[in-house]
Protein backbone atom coordinates (compact mmCIF):
# COMPACT_ATOMS: atom_id res chain seq x y z
CA UNK A 1 0.00 0.00 0.00
CA UNK A 2 1.42 3.35 -0.98
CA UNK A 3 1.75 6.13 1.56
CA UNK A 4 3.71 8.64 -0.51
CA UNK A 5 1.74 11.32 -2.33
CA UNK A 6 2.85 13.99 -4.77
CA UNK A 7 2.06 17.70 -4.64
CA UNK A 8 0.73 19.46 -7.70
CA UNK A 9 3.42 20.95 -9.93
CA UNK A 10 4.17 24.61 -9.19
CA UNK A 11 2.85 27.29 -11.53
CA UNK A 12 6.23 29.02 -11.55
CA UNK A 13 8.43 27.43 -14.22
CA UNK A 14 11.62 28.27 -12.34
CA UNK A 15 10.36 26.41 -9.26
CA UNK A 16 9.47 23.42 -11.43
CA UNK A 17 12.88 23.37 -13.13
CA UNK A 18 15.20 24.20 -10.23
CA UNK A 19 13.20 23.87 -7.01
CA UNK A 20 13.74 21.03 -4.52
CA UNK A 21 10.21 19.57 -4.68
CA UNK A 22 9.56 16.47 -6.78
CA UNK A 23 6.17 17.23 -8.33
CA UNK A 24 5.75 14.83 -11.26
CA UNK A 25 3.57 16.02 -14.13
CA UNK A 26 1.34 13.09 -15.03
CA UNK A 27 -0.42 13.23 -18.41
CA UNK A 28 -4.20 13.35 -18.97
CA UNK A 29 -4.36 9.59 -18.36
CA UNK A 30 -2.49 9.91 -15.07
CA UNK A 31 0.77 8.49 -16.44
CA UNK A 32 4.40 9.55 -16.64
CA UNK A 33 6.98 8.07 -19.03
CA UNK A 34 9.82 6.09 -17.45
CA UNK A 35 13.07 5.49 -19.32
CA UNK A 36 15.01 2.57 -17.81
CA UNK A 37 18.75 1.93 -18.17
CA UNK A 38 21.23 -0.47 -16.61
CA UNK A 39 22.92 1.15 -13.60
CA UNK A 40 26.21 -0.56 -14.44
CA UNK A 41 26.82 -0.05 -18.14
CA UNK A 42 24.11 2.49 -19.07
CA UNK A 43 22.42 0.24 -21.65
CA UNK A 44 18.88 1.26 -22.55
CA UNK A 45 16.61 -1.51 -21.26
CA UNK A 46 13.03 -0.34 -21.69
CA UNK A 47 10.54 2.51 -21.76
CA UNK A 48 7.40 2.14 -19.69
CA UNK A 49 4.76 4.19 -17.91
CA UNK A 50 3.97 4.79 -14.27
CA UNK A 51 0.91 6.11 -12.53
CA UNK A 52 1.18 7.81 -9.13
CA UNK A 53 0.82 4.50 -7.30
CA UNK A 54 3.57 2.80 -9.32
CA UNK A 55 5.91 5.75 -8.85
CA UNK A 56 5.22 5.90 -5.11
CA UNK A 57 5.76 2.15 -4.70
CA UNK A 58 9.01 2.38 -6.65
CA UNK A 59 10.27 5.17 -4.41
CA UNK A 60 9.11 3.45 -1.22
CA UNK A 61 10.38 -0.06 -2.00
CA UNK A 62 13.38 0.51 -4.24
CA UNK A 63 11.90 -1.99 -6.71
CA UNK A 64 10.53 -0.83 -10.07
CA UNK A 65 6.75 -0.87 -10.47
CA UNK A 66 4.95 0.23 -13.62
CA UNK A 67 1.44 0.70 -14.94
CA UNK A 68 0.54 -1.58 -17.83
CA UNK A 69 -1.57 0.31 -20.34
CA UNK A 70 -2.63 -2.90 -22.11
CA UNK A 71 -3.58 -4.78 -18.94
CA UNK A 72 -4.73 -1.61 -17.18
CA UNK A 73 -3.10 -2.55 -13.92
CA UNK A 74 -0.10 -1.98 -11.72
CA UNK A 75 2.77 -4.37 -12.28
CA UNK A 76 5.95 -5.10 -10.34
CA UNK A 77 8.66 -5.66 -12.95
CA UNK A 78 9.87 -9.24 -12.71
CA UNK A 79 6.90 -10.56 -10.75
CA UNK A 80 6.44 -13.35 -13.33
CA UNK A 81 9.96 -13.83 -14.69
CA UNK A 82 12.03 -13.18 -11.57
CA UNK A 83 13.89 -10.38 -13.38
CA UNK A 84 13.16 -7.81 -10.69
CA UNK A 85 14.60 -4.33 -11.19
CA UNK A 86 16.35 -2.89 -8.12
CA UNK A 87 16.33 0.88 -8.50
CA UNK A 88 19.73 2.49 -7.93
CA UNK A 89 18.83 6.05 -8.94
CA UNK A 90 15.85 8.02 -10.21
CA UNK A 91 16.14 11.27 -12.14
CA UNK A 92 13.52 13.54 -13.64
CA UNK A 93 13.73 15.80 -16.67
CA UNK A 94 13.57 19.60 -16.57
CA UNK A 95 9.78 19.88 -16.53
CA UNK A 96 9.18 16.71 -14.50
CA UNK A 97 7.03 14.93 -17.10
CA UNK A 98 9.42 12.00 -17.59
CA UNK A 99 11.67 10.02 -15.29
CA UNK A 100 14.83 7.99 -15.74
CA UNK A 101 15.42 4.89 -13.65
CA UNK A 102 18.89 3.39 -13.34
CA UNK A 103 18.39 -0.23 -12.29
CA UNK A 104 20.15 -3.50 -11.58
CA UNK A 105 18.25 -6.48 -12.97
CA UNK A 106 18.08 -9.68 -10.92
CA UNK A 107 17.27 -13.15 -12.17
CA UNK A 108 18.32 -13.81 -15.75
CA UNK A 109 19.45 -10.19 -16.36
CA UNK A 110 16.69 -9.86 -18.94
CA UNK A 111 14.27 -6.96 -19.09
CA UNK A 112 12.22 -7.78 -22.20
CA UNK A 113 9.34 -10.25 -22.05
CA UNK A 114 10.92 -11.87 -25.13
CA UNK A 115 13.81 -13.03 -22.94
CA UNK A 116 16.30 -10.48 -24.22
CA UNK A 117 18.31 -8.13 -22.04
CA UNK A 118 16.73 -5.04 -23.61
CA UNK A 119 13.42 -4.30 -25.29
CA UNK A 120 15.46 -2.41 -27.91
CA UNK A 121 16.89 -5.41 -29.77
CA UNK A 122 16.09 -4.22 -33.33
CA UNK A 123 17.35 -1.41 -35.52
CA UNK A 124 15.11 0.50 -37.91
CA UNK A 125 16.33 1.22 -41.42
CA UNK A 126 15.24 1.59 -45.02
CA UNK A 127 15.66 -1.10 -47.68
CA UNK A 128 14.39 -0.57 -51.22
CA UNK A 129 12.11 2.25 -50.10
CA UNK A 130 10.54 0.26 -47.26
CA UNK A 131 11.04 0.70 -43.52
CA UNK A 132 12.57 -2.52 -42.19
CA UNK A 133 13.58 -3.99 -38.85
CA UNK A 134 16.80 -5.89 -38.26
CA UNK A 135 17.35 -7.93 -35.10
CA UNK A 136 20.70 -6.96 -33.58
CA UNK A 137 20.42 -8.93 -30.32
CA UNK A 138 18.88 -12.36 -30.63
CA UNK A 139 20.32 -13.78 -27.40
CA UNK A 140 17.59 -15.09 -25.11
CA UNK A 141 18.48 -15.06 -21.44
CA UNK A 142 15.74 -17.48 -20.46
CA UNK A 143 13.30 -19.99 -21.91
CA UNK A 144 9.96 -18.19 -22.28
CA UNK A 145 7.81 -21.31 -21.96
CA UNK A 146 9.56 -22.42 -18.81
CA UNK A 147 9.63 -19.04 -17.06
CA UNK A 148 6.10 -17.93 -17.88
CA UNK A 149 4.59 -21.40 -17.33
CA UNK A 150 5.80 -21.20 -13.73
CA UNK A 151 4.01 -17.93 -13.03
UniProtKB/Swiss-Prot annotation:
It is found in: Cytoplasm. Mg(2+) binds at residues 93, 95, 97. Its main location: cytoplasm. Binds 1 Mg(2+) ion per subunit. Pathway: Amino-acid biosynthesis; L-histidine biosynthesis; L-histidine from 5-phospho-alpha-D-ribose 1-diphosphate: step 3/9. Its cofactor is Mg(2+); Zn(2+). Residues 1-20 are annotated as: Disordered. One of its GO terms (cellular component) is cytoplasm. Gene3D superfamilies: 4.10.80.70, Phosphoribosyl-AMP cyclohydrolase (3.10.20.810). Zn(2+) binds at residues 94, 112, 119. Keywords: Amino-acid biosynthesis, Cytoplasm, Histidine biosynthesis, Hydrolase, Magnesium, Metal-binding, Zinc. InterPro entries: PRA-CH (IPR026660), PRib_AMP_CycHydrolase_dom (IPR002496), PRib_AMP_CycHydrolase_sf (IPR038019). It catalyses: 1-(5-phospho-beta-D-ribosyl)-5'-AMP + H2O = 1-(5-phospho-beta-D-ribosyl)-5-[(5-phospho-beta-D-ribosylamino)methylideneamino]imidazole-4-carboxamide. GO terms for biological process: L-histidine biosynthetic process. Residues 1-13 have a biased composition (Polar residues). Homodimer. Catalyzes the hydrolysis of the adenine ring of phosphoribosyl-AMP. NCBIfam families: PRK00051.1 (NF000768). HAMAP family: HisI. This is Phosphoribosyl-AMP cyclohydrolase. It comes from Sinorhizobium medicae (strain WSM419) (Ensifer medicae). The gene is hisI.
